[in-house]
């Protein structure tokens, strides 16, 4: 016989197969009750990881719409920053214990989830962490095809070049037992020709950094061509020097006749074992 926690996770997983990002708060709240949680609040981080933004349609225990929170000045933000469970009590729900749990995909911080639990203890924390892990995976799986999510995590519109590059970049953070990768790009909303890429191939880590001249659309397109050429040739097993030559050739083929050499990117490719 399955436990309450197992039923909650299994039911949520089954329910979300044909649901979108907009359905996630409702489905999580419904199935979390089976695990003993009386109230659920899901927040995701914005592009610059300065704010925690609630998924739409959620309300606090008093029935008020959830507000955006600063990461550097709130208890949910502390859970996000410290990557640990933060305990407090709900001010709207008669002091019910409230757990703030980070949403993680590996080491990438997605946001936080707040869970009100009338009974606090080790089992409750374990169930909260399990639920948070599943919710994080669902956010990751639903966000690539959700325009509402893309709008939610942007404090202002992206430039066209930033739109191109953000959709090509790998996650900003990755870690396993042997290596940690952590990245950041600024200005996040106006980045032009700056980009990075990395990938594991067995025990080998490939890292590439691109810097096309300028901050306009042409710089973003040049960097995207460089990244695609790098990936394509890297996947086919080419050596570093040959990858660099392939990047240069791809940019030359795609550049209009007479375009200045300054529009080509500087690139750094590295491989570590």
List each language-model region with its residue ranges:
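Amphipathic alpha-helical "output/dimerization" segments
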Residues: 121-140, 224-228
């Amino acid at each position: 016989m399955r436990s309450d926690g197992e039923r909650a996770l299994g039911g949520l997983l089954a329910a979300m197969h044909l649901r979108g990002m907009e359905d996630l708060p409702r489905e999580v709240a419904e199935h979390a009750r089976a695990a003993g949680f009386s109230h659920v609040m899901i927040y995701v981080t914005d592009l610059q990881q300065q704010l925690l933004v609630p998924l739409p349609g959620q309300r606090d225990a008093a029935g008020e719409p959830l507000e955006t929170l600063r990461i550097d000045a709130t208890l949910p933000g502390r859970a996000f920053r410290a990557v640990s469970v933060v305990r407090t009590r709900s001010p709207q729900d008669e002091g019910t214990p409230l757990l703030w749990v980070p949403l993680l995909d590996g080491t990438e911080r997605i946001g936080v989830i707040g869970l009100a639990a009338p009974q606090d203890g080790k089992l409750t924390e374990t169930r909260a962490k399990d639920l948070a892990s599943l919710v994080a995976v669902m956010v990751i799986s639903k966000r690539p095809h959700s325009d509402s999510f893309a709008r939610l995590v942007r404090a202002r519109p992206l430039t066209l070049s930033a739109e191109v590059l953000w959709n090509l970049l790998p996650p900003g953070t990755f870690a396993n037992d042997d290596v940690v990768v952590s990245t950041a790009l600024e200005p996040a909303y106006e980045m032009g020709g700056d980009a990075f890429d990395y990938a594991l191939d067995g025990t080998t880590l490939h890292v590439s950094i691109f810097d096309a001249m300028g901050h306009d659309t042409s710089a973003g397109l040049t960097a995207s061509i460089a990244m695609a050429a790098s990936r394509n040739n890297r996947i086919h097993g080419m050596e570093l020097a040959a990858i660099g030559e392939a990047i240069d050739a791809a940019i030359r083929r795609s550049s209009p006749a007479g375009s200045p050499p300054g529009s080509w990117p500087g690139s750094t490719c590295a491989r570590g074992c």
